Amino acid sequence: MATTPRLASLLLLLALCAAAAGALRLPPDASFPGAQAERLIRALNLLPGRPRRGLGAGAEDVAPGQLLERRVTLPGLPEGVGDLGHHAGYYRLPNTHDARMFYFFFESRGKKEDPVVIWLTGGPGCSSELAVFYENGPFTIANNMSLVWNKFGWDKISNIIFVDPATGTGFSYSSDDRDTRHDEAGVSNDLYDFLQVFFKKHPEFVKNDFFITGESYAGHYIPAFASRVHQGNKKNEGTHINLKGFAIGNGLTDPAIQYKAYTDYALDMNLIQKADYDRINKFIPPCEFAIKLCGTDGKASCMAAYMVCNSIFNSIMKLVGTKNYYDVRKECEGKLCYDFSNLEKFFGDKAVRQAIGVGDIEFVSCSTSVYQAMLTDWMRNLEVGIPALLEDGINVLIYAGEYDLICNWLGNSRWVHSMEWSGQKDFAKTAESSFLVDDAQAGVLKSHGALSFLKVHNAGHMVPMDQPKAALEMLRRFTQGKLKESVPEEEPATTFYAAI
């Protein structure tokens, strides 16, 4: 039987993998995505819940293509705070068998005219509620399960939506496995459909500036989602969404460039020695070859690329040991790098579940099933859609905490500089400037035209958690078109904020 060129390439790839694996003496589970998914999630103390089947008792149903939303005052808030303009709801996805997307919507503490911002947490398969309560939401959870106001919450300056975008993540669920998404096309179409219904529900916000934000695997979600919104606007498909820009924090966007940067970053940060660097770099050529086969198809070759290229990261982690790969300044305590267990406890409270309308639907912080379903999407290059957005004037901010290993600033900076667009040469020639917050350097900024890159000091993977004030200032200046300004205009005090 004749061998097709693609099959021959895959066979060659497997041979290269075997040779490189022998040279590296990798651990037995180094190339198996299931084992890695479980290890990554356990390291974050985010154990996946059981698969959800059907509508949970007490959860409100909603017709396909419709949105069911309620105003929310969460238990644990101080008494007498009044109506905060907080909402929670489900969107019943059309063109699915039984999928429902969960979201929070927090109106701005400032003005109704503030921009509408949507936040997407990555994973893939991790809930945006992690950001609500640990990063940039209105409040954090105290150990006694009370809620403490976050004075740097992004709702201070925006009307912000937090969505669990993939079925099986957070409180989003379906009774039918066929609703599981495997690529960005499915996720971005779901999000676009959600926005169409959301703005019909909230027409008072439809003319506001709109920005897409997120971190980690949202480096895949966001470019595809932004392109979907932009194309929908161009084709007059429905309600015009006033997309002005998007921001990706410590994202995975161009794997071919970012995986190659792992060893350089690890060596620069003294995580590995030069001999380790030379040895692990033997995996880079087969990784590059595998990604080339993958292209932008998201097929079986992309799974092979995932297995090959993650051997680079796994080999580094074998040497790094107990260090936190989301923040290399820190050690993981045992198997746990961060403890988000208060979130599980909070959502286990019956009063909380009744308040947000989820009934007994099980909350899943991070889902291994969603992670595995997206594996063929992992090594795809999502940078390819960004130049067209830049050319049409959509503002793009790529930011990265300097101490993150897994989606490090070096790899992000390299793909940003390598991106081909009309301003590429001028961007490369632009001098870096200090990003100042309270007259102190909070980061280093490079900006030209619609493109900006910000390296954030003293932060790891989750910049809004590590540097909340700098993150809020970043959002303020980005959404106001003043990112290059060192000192923002004084924010007028509001009676509302003073009251809380």
UniProtKB/Swiss-Prot annotation:
It catalyses: Release of a C-terminal amino acid with broad specificity. Residues 22-73, 485-500 form a propeptide. Glycans are attached at residue 144. Substrate binds at residue 407. GO terms for molecular function: serine-type carboxypeptidase activity. It comes from Triticum aestivum. The keyword Secreted does not apply. Disulfide bonds join 126-366, 294-309, 332-337. Residues 1-21 form the signal peptide. PANTHER family: SERINE CARBOXYPEPTIDASE-LIKE 48 (PTHR11802:SF259), SERINE PROTEASE FAMILY S10 SERINE CARBOXYPEPTIDASE (PTHR11802). Its EC number is 3.4.16.5. GO terms for biological process: proteolysis. Induction: By gibberellic acid (GA). Keywords: Carboxypeptidase, Disulfide bond, Glycoprotein, Hydrolase, Protease, Signal, Zymogen. InterPro entries: AB_hydrolase_fold, Peptidase_S10, Ser_caboxypep_his_AS, Ser_caboxypep_ser_AS. It holds the Pfam family Peptidase_S10. Belongs to the peptidase S10 family. This is Serine carboxypeptidase 3. Gene3D superfamilies: alpha/beta hydrolase (3.40.50.1820). Monomer. One of its GO terms (cellular component) is vacuole. The active site is at residues 216, 404, 461.
